[in-house]
């Protein structure tokens, strides 16, 4: 089973929005305000297979709010796996700065959002290469959950201008299935 918890009590309508998404996906949503509330809610749902914690979208330059969010998220415990969500439309220098600012959170991977809103993702590739962080998921539209997908090398390469993916080689190598994220050996050629 899946559960969602939001700590976003800052943005107007945030709670209603996440509850709507939860309703669409058939996932129960809990709202918390403090680290203690988060700890108790996680403990209450300890039988869940997956607990997703929605956070406040904060500026990487707001040190006070980031420290507060980090303090609250510490209640998730050491087993929590944090993913940083970044928009594909963000310029490379701002993306790299955001990744640096969020490093104290010890995030494991990056979720790239709004891939459908840009034709160029060199900024994403540059920032991720500099920070040595993998992409875990991408979003490619407004539909939830249909437009969320696990990141695959093939999909990322198809988004790069000037690259084409040799589908015949991929089908030959993987039997028609797309490669899994852990297999980064997809062949791409410059066109």
Pin down the residues of each PLM region.
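Inter-motif core of Ras-like GTPase G domains
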Residues: 43-53, 64-90
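Conserved beta-strand/loop subsegment of P-loop NTPase cores
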Residues: 3, 53, 78-86, 103-145
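Switch I (G2) and immediately adjacent beta-strands of P-loop GTPase domains
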Residues: 17-22, 36-55
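NTP-binding/hydrolysis catalytic cores, primarily Walker-type P-loop NTPases
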Residues: 108, 126-191
């Amino acid at each position: 089973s899946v559960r969602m918890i939001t700590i976003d009590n800052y943005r107007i309508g945030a709670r209603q929005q996440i509850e709507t998404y939860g309703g669409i996906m058939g996932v129960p949503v809990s709202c918390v305000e403090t680290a203690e509330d988060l700890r108790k809610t996680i403990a209450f749902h300890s039988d869940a297979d997956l607990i997703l914690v929605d956070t406040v979208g904060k500026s990487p330059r707001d040190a006070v709010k980031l420290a507060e969010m980090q303090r609250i998220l510490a209640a998730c415990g050491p087993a929590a796996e944090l993913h940083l969500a970044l928009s594909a439309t963000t310029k490379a220098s701002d993306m790299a700065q955001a990744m640096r600012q969020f490093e104290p959170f010890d995030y494991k991977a990056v979720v790239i959002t709004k891939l459908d809103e840009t034709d160029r993702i060199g900024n994403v590739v540059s920032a991720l290469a500099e920070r040595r962080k993998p992409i875990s998921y991408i979003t490619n539209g407004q539909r939830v959950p249909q437009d969320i997908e696990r990141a695959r090398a093939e999909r990322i390469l198809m988004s790069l201008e000037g690259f084409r993916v040799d589908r015949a080689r991929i089908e030959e190598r993987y039997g028609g299935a797309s490669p899994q994220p852990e297999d980064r050996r997809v062949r791409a050629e410059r066109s």
